[in-house]
Amino acid sequence: MIQPQTYLNVADNSGARELMCIRIIGASNRRYAHIGDVIVAVIKEAIPNTPLERSEVIRAVIVRTCKELKRNNGTIIRYDDNAAVVIDQEGNPKGTRVFGAIPRELRQLNFTKIVSLAPEVL
């Protein structure tokens, strides 16, 4: 469960390393975001000499959370960190690689480009 002021790791090579959630895209007063939700975030830590800079406001999709994800068949998936992938306004990832495991629920949410870049889909 991601809420405003939550820090997230970046799971791609876009140039950002750490994000802080500002807002959850969707309903006007949504409290928490889960895997597959789009958030507005600010870059708190960035790699030098990359297109993304610190304090830049961007959009990102959440790909991993510490809070469990329950599936319809009864399985539960839990990750070790909270992570997101930086996206543009159309929903395409800004980076060319995605690091770490990605849940298959992102495919149903039309983030197929992120799923195709991922090394492992759970």
From Swiss-Prot:
SMART domains: Ribosomal_L14 (SM01374)
Gene Ontology cellular component list: chloroplast; chloroplast stroma; chloroplast thylakoid; large ribosomal subunit
Domain of life where this protein originates: Eukaryota
Keywords on record: Chloroplast, Plastid, Ribonucleoprotein, Ribosomal protein, RNA-binding, rRNA-binding
InterPro entries per record: Ribosomal_uL14, Ribosomal_uL14_bac-type, Ribosomal_uL14_CS, Ribosomal_uL14_sf
Subcellular location: Plastid, Chloroplast
GO molecular function: mRNA binding; rRNA binding; structural constituent of ribosome
Main location: plastid
Coiled-coil segments: none
GO biological process per UniProt: translation
Keyword Zinc: no
Keyword RNA-binding listed: yes
Database matches in Pfam families: Ribosomal_L14
HAMAP family (alphabetical): Ribosomal_uL14
Family membership: Belongs to the universal ribosomal protein uL14 family.
Function: Binds to 23S rRNA.
NCBIfam families found in the cross-reference section: rplN_bact
Subunit: Part of the 50S ribosomal subunit.
The name this protein goes by in its record: Large ribosomal subunit protein uL14c
The organism of origin for this protein: Arabidopsis thaliana
